[in-house]
Amino acid sequence: DVYKRQTSGSGAQDRIRITQRLLPAVPLGVQQATLVQLPPGTPDTVDATALPAYTQAVALPAGALPGRGGLKITLQPRLAQGLSGVRDWFENYPYTCLEQQASRAIGLGDAALWSRVVETMPTYLDEDGLANYFPPRSGDAARGSDTLTAYLLAASDQAATTDPAFALPPELRTRMQNGLLRFVEGRLERRFWSPRPDLEVRKLAALEALSRGGQVTARLLGSLSADPNRWPTSAVVDWLSILRRVTDAPLRERHLQEAGQVLRSRLSVQGTRLVFSTESTDEWWWLMAGGDTNAARLLLAVMDDPAWREDLPRLVTGLIGRQQRNGAWRTTTANLWGSLALQDFGRRFESVPVDGTTQA
């Protein structure tokens, strides 16, 4: 409050008052969270005390500020409610390279848009069957991307498990698969700038895409170092998926166990957000890989693995917790893999309608 008055003459005066709102120095935040599936009751149960119950012991965290915070309990029939934020994000997305077009069509579940993308896709392939982000000009050297080709094959295959309309036409798919196969075998070379050596990680992504079509044999795995501790999380997820599909892989059970242990050791749930301990080194953006896509693809990779069954709800809520404030993830690839993962989870575990009442 500032006051000023003229001491001579007319004695004019003025006053300025500024109101400032003081907010707590420590904002509220989720310190710990849990997710449970409530046991169902029987329709004819009259006595509420006889119904199945869930109890959870709680206590104030050490050093909690008096009078701040509390418990928040929410109930919902599905963990992913419509993904409206992702749909809005895709509907307003303005860019149009091949990856972005494909991600948008599949992410929106728009079969007509996907059909138009597929119609033009052959013009994006080089002479070896590998896809470019933009159509190459006549006379250009073959510069198709093994990374983009693997992504298109894997994403369309995953989407087709729910809606066959998103499968690639057989002739186009075979042409792309053959290009990837030659790349994995070393008969086809692609050199691109990268901030670190990435050939083995690129081969793992290609093998994961090829394994979906049953084209990976034990012989093709022989050139890999099979050292997941050295790999980024995206490569470990690829390795786990490959091993689950290639049943005659050498030392398969040992490698499966090792890959699972590496992934579990990197997992951490902070409040309601899933993070990896290697997050700072997992952003392989030039290969379209990062924390968001890793979380989504891990969920897909372990969806039907009994050893991960108890972890699935935590993986789902942790994946959702990685969304930005607009209810979407940061990139086209993350939004596509995230939506595919949550749709697959809902189809497998949330297909039965929920009704009745719950008391808390």
Residue ranges and their predicted role:
Residues D1-T7, G11-D14, P52-A53, A59-G63, ...:
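Long, domain-scale non-catalytic interaction/scaffolding regions in large secretory-pathway
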Residues D1-P197, K203-E208, A218-G222, W285-L287:
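Extended, solvent-exposed functional surface patches
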